[in-house]
């Protein structure tokens, strides 16, 4: 794995910020895009732009074929049984809202329950919360310990309470904890409960096999895996997608329409109302191909070394406290320093060329659990280097001295 060759594919990294080389460590928020992705979307608008599924002319057919080929590529990437199990969405958030809305229309009744975990991003909390509150139901929450590890004994106890659906993060966007999703899916299925996996933080860093996990649904965003913004995916087992009613209504998702009734299209089209983001879907396919052409195991090992190096070096800072210390972690490190506000630290190291995320990371209940207002989060990608980790740690050390 040649880091320099990889970095050369990401022109945004080759710049200075405030006179310092850019160190981009905000990859959990969004990854940068390789030239092949940028060029593919550009080429679509230059040479192929057309609405799909609706025309007999050359451009429409060409764009339709490209779009559906992208769907099949994504299906193969996550080992779905076929392209009909892949619904293109705007991202993880829309995918989860789609599921919450469709589940509600299908079988949520007064007093029902939904099960999530204590480490969820707001996108995997608020849609379920709002849905269940409309029916005077209960949101059950799997607790975690001080290291950011879920209590699976309590999880099983909560499963016995009969939630209608379980929705859990594969990897926490704050803690970096890798949850035992395969085990959790098996446990839920023993009680006949469907499981949704939020894969926003895992899709870029780990090889995903939805059939091996056996989840009923898996959702992710393209922009967190080197693809354009505005495109994401909802994978669902076909038998579940067949049952669920449409989320939105309009063009393309219908079969027949009259003033008296409407029938809906087949999978996956009944969930894709209106004109889709074709260019971004083609960019997503290109990002998938980009990842598949790499040694994924070598990438995982490289990112793990970056994380361990960062943790080891940061540990020497007086007063540092890591938020999330699970043995199985991936991709990121969150921390606070005694007497230093995360926003102040983030602002100062930005002036040193280092981009990190500060705040509650759209996970306020996690901050409440640890009794803090927010954290500094550094998140890594394949194009980051050990030198960048060292620059980041040195910047944090300097900022901490300035702020105390």
Regions found by a protein language model. Give the residues of each.
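Pyridoxal 5′-phosphate
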Residues: 1-404
């Amino acid at each position: 794995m040649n880091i320099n060759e990889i970095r050369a594919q990401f022109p945004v990294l080759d710049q200075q910020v405030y006179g310092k080389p850019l160190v981009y460590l905000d990859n959990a928020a969004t990854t940068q895009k390789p030239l092949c992705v940028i060029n593919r979307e550009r080429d679509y608008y230059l040479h192929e732009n057309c609405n799909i599924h609706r025309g007999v002319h050359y451009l429409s057919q060409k764009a339709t074929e490209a779009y559906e080929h992208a769907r099949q590529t994504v299906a193969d990437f996550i080992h779905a049984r076929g392209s009909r199990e892949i619904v293109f969405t705007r991202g993880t958030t829309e995918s989860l809202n789609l599921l919450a809305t469709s589940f509600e229309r299908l079988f949520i009744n007064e007093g029902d329950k939904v099960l999530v975990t204590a480490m969820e991003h707001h996108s995997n909390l608020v849609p379920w919360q709002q849905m269940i509150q409309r029916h005077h139901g209960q949101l059950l929450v799997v607790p975690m310990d001080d290291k950011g590890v879920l209590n699976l004994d309590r999880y099983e106890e909560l499963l016995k309470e009969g939630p209608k659906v379980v929705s859990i993060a594969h990897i926490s966007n704050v803690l970096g904890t890798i949850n035992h999703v395969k085990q959790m899916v098996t446990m839920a299925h023993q009680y006949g409960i469907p499981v949704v996996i939020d894969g926003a933080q895992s899709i870029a860093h780990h090889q995903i096999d939805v059939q091996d996990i056996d989840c009923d649904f898996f959702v992710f965003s393209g922009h967190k895996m080197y693809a354009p913004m505005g495109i994401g995916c909802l994978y669902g087992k076909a038998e579940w997608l067949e049952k669920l009613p449409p989320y939105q209504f309009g063009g393309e998702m219908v079969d027949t329409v009259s003033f008296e009734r409407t029938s809906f299209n087949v999978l996956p089209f009944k969930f894709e109302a209106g004109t889709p983001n074709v260019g971004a879907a083609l960019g997503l396919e290109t990002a998938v191909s980009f990842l598949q052409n790499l040694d994924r195991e070598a990438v995982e090992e490289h990112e793990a070394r970056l994380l361990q190096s960062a943790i080891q070096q940061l540990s020497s800072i007086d007063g540092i406290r890591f938020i999330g210390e699970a043995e199985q972690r991936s991709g990121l490190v969150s921390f606070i320093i005694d007497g230093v506000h995360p926003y102040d630290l983030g602002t100062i190291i930005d002036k040193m060329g280092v981009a990190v995320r500060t705040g509650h990371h759209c996970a306020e209940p996690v901050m409440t659990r640890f009794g803090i207002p927010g954290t500094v989060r550094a998140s890594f990608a394949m194009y980051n280097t050990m030198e960048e980790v060292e620059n980041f740690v040195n910047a944090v050390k300097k900022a901490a001295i300035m702020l105390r």
